[in-house]
Amino acid sequence: MGRKRKGRDISGWLVVDKPAGLTSTAVVNKVRWAFDAKKAGHAGTLDPEATGVLAVALGEATKTVPFITDAMKAYTFTVTLGAATNTDDAEGEVIATSAERPTDDDIKEALLGFIGEIQQVPPKFSAVKIDGQRAYKLARDGEEVELSARPLWVEELVMLDRPDADHVVLEMTCGKGGYVRSIARDLGEKLGCLGHVRELRRIWSGPFDAEDGVTLEQIDALAKSPEIDQFLRPLEEGLADLPELKCTPQGATRLRNGNPGMVIASDVEYGEEAWASLEGKAVAVGTFKAGELHPSRVFNQD
């Protein structure tokens, strides 16, 4: 019999404004400790030196993590022009330099080529797996890392500022699996001047905004106290991109037991993914078919 997990059965989302210098895992561990939560996870890794939205799910909200991971995200970032690094950010070693510097118009024109569906090769220092091993571990060991290009949807990529000839500030809105470091690297190569990320901030992720985020100082100040629960947001916010269907108490009972349950639907199409609620609380996520929701995930909420 497995060991019983210690902690509170607490569920919800905590939007953390992650500071630079911490891994995403370290932030999740701190949140789990501060809330004395049995279960916690995050919806999308941020590099250690990156800041901004890190959405942490507690308890039953962890079942909604895939919907935030798949959601659109936005970043602001500064690209240093004239140098490439082995990590594609400022933490790595400079491996090549260039004296070329593009004009503002050159940059704006080049950015157009990164909008829409693009093919992107992840950085060699990334968590992508190659034959079961993380790429960054192979790269650290000095092994040659070859990563395949993968599709990425870029909704928007614009220049916000050009503080000097060596730097450009950009904002990007993109879908799942985007590497900002790869954008900086590929933009530098396209402009003929090389480039890498100097600073990176995730300003929103799905329904969660950095400006609404909680700092680690706020978490530390209220850790292990009842007052810390004020920062939690309902797990239902993790389902913001799915249509909501109302269900009856009888339908909710069936859904909680893993069976199809009757729901009230108007604008949902047959076969569409949706979630069912009873008195505002999520009961299940599933597929809508002929007046019923066929559950794929069930929430255990009081």
Swiss-Prot record:
UniProt cross-references to Gene3D superfamilies, sorted A to Z: Pseudouridine synthase
EC class: isomerase
BP GO annotations: mRNA pseudouridine synthesis; tRNA pseudouridine synthesis
Protein EC: 5.4.99.25
InterPro entries for the chain: PsdUridine_synth_cat_dom_sf, PsdUridine_synth_N, tRNA_psdUridine_synth_TruB, TruB_C
Protein family per UniProt: Belongs to the pseudouridine synthase TruB family. Type 1 subfamily.
Protein task: Responsible for synthesis of pseudouridine from uracil-55 in the psi GC loop of transfer RNAs.
Protein name per UniProt: tRNA pseudouridine synthase B
The organism of origin for this protein: Ruegeria sp. (strain TM1040)
Highest classification ranks of the organism: Bacteria, Pseudomonadati, Pseudomonadota, Alphaproteobacteria, Rhodobacterales
